[in-house]
């Protein structure tokens, strides 16, 4: 059974569990995904499935993608991702992949792109402490010293400084599936997941 899927984040809400507790959940619409390519260890060196998600008309795809998607006998896709598998014998090009590999209570890892925050300072970006507010202090939100003077006479690599924040690939691990609605391709995952509404998400079974 395949244990990976592509989807879009819908938003957050809360539902009541069986014991009456209120559980915050993220609603995600996963799949359906189509197998656009099967990679085998004999030919490619490893076993993997290439999945297409979010259908797109072939007329809006470039020629290399049209040729690639035509082999699967399906329309074009906006998103194509690769998932490693142990064995590819049970899969074929053009096959639809659903939520059969997931069940309520499973632990999953969810990957996505974090929200963009623009240019941010060290307090917001790295969690620095702020300076004193009174007694003539003029160092309220400044980062402070960023290096030495005589030696090494440069700013070392990796120094935490102000800059662009967000739009990074993030993975949240061991999230619990609270509910699955196969008819609507909806999965409710406990807690928040990376990204904005309608953002692309990848779900994998936690090891």
Curated annotation (Swiss-Prot):
- GO BP terms in the entry: translation
Instruction: Note the PROSITE patterns from the entry.
Output: RIBOSOMAL_L3
**What is one GO cellular-component annotation here?**
cytosolic large ribosomal subunit
Q: Does the keyword Chaperone apply?
A: no
Pfam families the UniProt entry points to: Ribosomal_L3 (PF00297)
Keywords, in A-Z order: Ribonucleoprotein, Ribosomal protein, RNA-binding, rRNA-binding
Cite a single GO MF annotation. rRNA binding
User: What PANTHER family does the annotation carry?
Assistant: 50S RIBOSOMAL PROTEIN L3, LARGE RIBOSOMAL SUBUNIT PROTEIN UL3C
Note the subunit structure.
Answer: Part of the 50S ribosomal subunit. Forms a cluster with proteins L14 and L19.
In the record, the note on similarity to other proteins reads: Belongs to the universal ribosomal protein uL3 family.
Q: State the function annotated in the UniProt record.
A: One of the primary rRNA binding proteins, it binds directly near the 3'-end of the 23S rRNA, where it nucleates assembly of the 50S subunit.
Name of this protein: Large ribosomal subunit protein uL3
Q: What is the lineage of its organism?
A: Bacteria, Pseudomonadati, Thermodesulfobacteriota, Desulfobacteria, Desulfobacterales
**Coding gene?**
rplC
């Amino acid at each position: 059974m395949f244990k990976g899927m592509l989807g879009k984040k819908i938003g957050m809400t809360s539902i009541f569990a069986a014991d009456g507790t209120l559980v915050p959940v993220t609603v995600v619409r996963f799949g359906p995904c189509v197998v656009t390519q099967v990679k085998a260890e004999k030919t490619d060196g490893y076993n993997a499935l290439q999945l297409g998600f979010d259908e797109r008309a072939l007329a809006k795809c470039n020629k290399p993608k049209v040729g690639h998607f035509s082999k699967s006998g399906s329309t074009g896709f906006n998103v194509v991702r690769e998932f490693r598998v142990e064995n590819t014998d049970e899969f074929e090009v053009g096959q639809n992949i659903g939520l059969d590999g997931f069940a309520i209570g499973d632990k999953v890892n969810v990957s996505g792109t974090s929200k963009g925050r623009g240019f941010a300072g060290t307090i917001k970006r790295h969690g620095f402490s702020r300076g004193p507010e009174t007694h003539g202090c003029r160092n309220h939100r400044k980062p402070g010293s960023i290096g030495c003077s005589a030696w090494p006479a440069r700013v070392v690599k990796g120094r935490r400084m102000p800059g662009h924040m967000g739009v990074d690939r993030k993975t949240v691990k061991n999230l619990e599936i609270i509910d699955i609605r196969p008819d609507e391709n909806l999965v409710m995952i406990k807690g928040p997941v990376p990204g904005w509404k309608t953002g692309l998400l990848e779900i994998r079974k936690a090891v």
